From Swiss-Prot:
GO terms for molecular function: nucleic acid binding. It holds the Pfam family R3H. Keywords: Coiled coil, Phosphoprotein. Residues 157-168 have a biased composition (Basic and acidic residues). SMART domains: R3H. Residues 257-276 have a biased composition (Acidic residues). Residues 16-81 form the R3H domain. It comes from the Eukaryota. CDD domains: R3H_unknown_1. Residues 154-225, 254-276 are annotated as: Disordered. The modification Phosphoserine is found at residue 236. This is R3H and coiled-coil domain-containing protein 1. Residues 242-300 form a coiled coil.
Length: 440
C-alpha cells in the first residue's frame, strides 16, 4: 500500500493505515444518507483528530468538528446540510493552505431545501456569510411534546369514533340506509345542541327530516324527553371513554419516550463518560447543527491500536489540589508554605485565582502533606478536587509526570562516571616482561 503524502510529508505506515480505515468509515456513513445521524469518534490524540479532519475534507457532503476539552476531546462527522455556518464561512475546523491547489473543480449541486440562490463567487452547496438557518436552533422538549400531544388527541378522537365517524358532527346524520334506525344519533345531536343554547335549537331542527317524511305526532312528542335524556347520557358516556382512552394513550407515550431517552443515554453514551458529561457533550454537538433531533452513531473502527495511553487520575496520585486561599497570594507565598518539600522538587501549577495544583516529587511526600494542616490554605487529593483542576492536570500529563528519583551513588562511582565523560583512560597495568627468544 502506497504511503499518502500530507502537507508535503509522507505519513507513517500506522497513520497511513489509520487514514485508509477512516475513509472506509466515512464511505459507509455517507451511503446511509440519513441526515439525522452523526458519527462520533472516541477520544483521540490531536494528531489523529487532525488526520480525521483532513480526510473528511475529501468528502463534499460531509463536515467535521470537535467537541469536548482536554484529553476527552472527540471528533464528530455530520452531513454538510445540517451544519451550522461558522462565522468565517467555513464549516471545517481548519482552512486549507493557500499554496495548495483547491480540490474543488466545479460548483456543487445546490441543496434541495428551497434556499435562495448562492451569490456569484460563493461556494455552491455551502453556507456563506450572512446566511442564517431557516429553523430555530433549539426547541425545548416541553414544546415538542405539547405539539405531539395536540396531534395525538385529534388522531385518537378520529380513530376511536364508531364506524370511523365523529359523533359530534351533524353532517353525518342521514347518511347510509334510510330504513335503518337513525333516531338515536339524531336525538343525541339535538340533545347536545340543547345544551349550547335555545337560540341554536330552531336552526338545527331540519336535521330531523331524513327520519321520516311525516311530522311527529302527539304520542311521539310525549316520549321525546326520555329519548333525549337517554341520548345525552350515551353521548356523555362516550365522551368520558374517549377522554380516558386519550389520557391512557398519552401516559403510555410519555413513558415510552422516557424509556427511549434512557436507552439512548445507556447505548449511545460512552462508557467512560458520566451522565453529566454526556449531556454536555450532546448539547455541544447540537449547538453545531441545525437539526436538533439527532442520533449518535459509534464508529465500527477499532481504534485501540492507534489510541495512545491516556493518563488517568490514578496516575496523578502525587498531585494535590490547593484551595481556599486568598486571591492575593502569589506563587512565592505558596512555595513558602511548602518549603519543606521544595528542596525535593515541589512545584506549583495554577488553575485559577483560588485554586492551584501542588506537584510533589513522590507519593510519600504527597501523603505526608495531606496529613498536615496549613493556616492560609487547604489541600486535598486530586480525585476529590474540582472539575477544572482535574481537567488542568489531565491536559498536561508530561508536566505532572512523576519524576524518577536519582539513584544513590558514592565517590568511586562518581569519579568513574566523570572519567568516562571526560574520556580519560585508566592507567594501563604493566605487562610482564617479554621472554627472550627460545633456543634453537
Amino acid at each position: 500500500m502506497a504511503l499518502l503524502c500530507l502537507d508535503g510529508v509522507f505519513l507513517s505506515s500506522a497513520e497511513n493505515d489509520f487514514v485508509h480505515r477512516i475513509q472506509e468509515e466515512l464511505d459507509r456513513f455517507l451511503l446511509q444518507k440519513q441526515l439525522s445521524k452523526v458519527l462520533l469518534f472516541p477520544p483521540l490524540s490531536s494528531r489523529l483528530r487532525y488526520l480525521i479532519h483532513r480526510t473528511a475534507e475529501n468528502f463534499d457532503l460531509l463536515s467535521s468538528f470537535s467537541v469536548g476539552e482536554g484529553w476527552k476531546r472527540r471528533t464528530v462527522i455530520c452531513h454538510q446540510d445540517i451544519r451550522v455556518p461558522s462565522s468565517d464561512g467555513l464549516s471545517g475546523p481548519c482552512r486549507a493552505p493557500a499554496s495548495c491547489p483547491s480540490r474543488y473543480h466545479g460548483p456543487r449541486p445546490i441543496s434541495n431545501q428551497g434556499a435562495a440562490a448562492v451569490p456569484r463567487g460563493a461556494r455552491a452547496g455551502r453556507w456563506y456569510r450572512g446566511r442564517k438557518p431557516d429553523q430555530p436552533l433549539y426547541v425545548p422538549r416541553v414544546l415538542r411534546r405539547q405539539e405531539e400531544w395536540g396531534l395525538t388527541s385529534t388522531s385518537v378522537l378520529k380513530r376511536e369514533a364508531p364506524a370511523g365517524r365523529d359523533p359530534e358532527e351533524p353532517g353525518d346524520v342521514g347518511a347510509g340506509d334510510p330504513n335503518s334506525d337513525q333516531g338515536l344519533p339524531v336525538l343525541m345531536t339535538q340533545g347536545t345542541e340543547d345544551l349550547k343554547g335555545p337560540g341554536q335549537r330552531c336552526e338545527n331542527e331540519p336535521l330531523l327530516d331524513p327520519v321520516g317524511p311525516e311530522p311527529l305526532g302527539p304520542e311521539s312528542q310525549s316520549g321525546k324527553g326520555d329519548m333525549v335524556e337517554m341520548a345525552t347520557r350515551f353521548g356523555s358516556t362516550l365522551q368520558l371513554d374517549l377522554e380516558k382512552g386519550k389520557e391512557s394513550l398519552l401516559e403510555k407515550r410519555l413513558v415510552a419516550e422516557e424509556e427511549e431517552d434512557e436507552e439512548e443515554v445507556e447505548e449511545d453514551g460512552p462508557s467512560s463518560c458520566s451522565e453529566d458529561d454526556y449531556s454536555e457533550l450532546l448539547q455541544e454537538i447540537t449547538d453545531n447543527l441545525t437539526k436538533k433531533e439527532i442520533q449518535i452513531e459509534k464508529i465500527h473502527l477499532d481504534t485501540s491500536s492507534f489510541v495512545e495511553e491516556l493518563p488517568g487520575e490514578k496516575d496523578l496520585a502525587h498531585v494535590v489540589e490547593i484551595y481556599d486561599f486568598e486571591p492575593a497570594l502569589k506563587t512565592e507565598d505558596l512555595l513558602a508554605t511548602f518549603s519543606e518539600f521544595q528542596e525535593k522538587g515541589f512545584r506549583i501549577q495554577w488553575v485559577d485565582d483560588t485554586h492551584a495544583l501542588g506537584i510533589f516529587p513522590c507519593l510519600a511526600s504527597a501523603a505526608e502533606a495531606l496529613t498536615r494542616e496549613f493556616s492560609v490554605l487547604k489541600i486535598r487529593p486530586l480525585t476529590q478536587g474540582t472539575k477544572q483542576s482535574k481537567l488542568k492536570a489531565l491536559q498536561r500529563p508530561k508536566l505532572l509526570r512523576l519524576v524518577k528519583e536519582r539513584p544513590q551513588t558514592n565517590a568511586t562511582v562518581a569519579r568513574r562516571l566523570v572519567a568516562r565523560a571526560l574520556g580519560l583512560q585508566h592507567k594501563k597495568k604493566e605487562r610482564p616482561a617479554v621472554r627472550g627468544p627460545l633456543p634453537p
